[in-house]
């Protein structure tokens, strides 16, 4: 079984400058101290940053904000799991659409996306998948 752990802040928490504190506490409170022998962290857990205020609203954090949170999460995973934390997948969710997917996938530490509403239209979803395939880290 592979778990997708979704982390995110409310609009009020973001406006108060608490995003990293909130997602850091969510991550720390949800992670095991270690994984059982024979189970690789990257195979057991995927972490997704999905700001609550962006879900279904059409609003998206800036690319700089997404990169900041993903860099923070990557550092936290490495601190917790060592090299295994580098290999764990980090996804972004929160109003991913064909018009912004390529820019989001080009960000460091963004390994994919949780796609909501855009997945309901085959053409839109296909464009998002193609954007992921073309992302620099996957070329």
Predicted regions and their residues:
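Active-site loop-to-helix "anion-binding N-cap" substructures in soluble metabolic enzymes
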Residues: 1-139
């Amino acid at each position: 079984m592979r778990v997708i752990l979704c982390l995110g802040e409310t609009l009020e928490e973001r406006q108060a400058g608490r995003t990293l504190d909130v997602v850091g506490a969510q991550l720390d409170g949800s992670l095991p101290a270690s994984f059982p022998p024979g189970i690789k962290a990257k195979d057991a857990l995927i972490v997704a940053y999905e700001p609550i205020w962006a879900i279904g609203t059409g609003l998206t954090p800036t690319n700089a904000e997404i990169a900041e949170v993903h860099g923070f999460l990557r550092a936290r995973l490495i601190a917790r799991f060592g090299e295994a934390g580098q290999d764990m997948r980090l996804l972004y969710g929160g109003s991913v659409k064909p018009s912004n997917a390529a820019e989001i996938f080009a960000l460091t530490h963004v390994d994919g996306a949780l796609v909501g509403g855009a997945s309901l239209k085959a053409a839109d979803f296909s464009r998002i998948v193609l954007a992921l395939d073309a992302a620099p880290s996957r070329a």
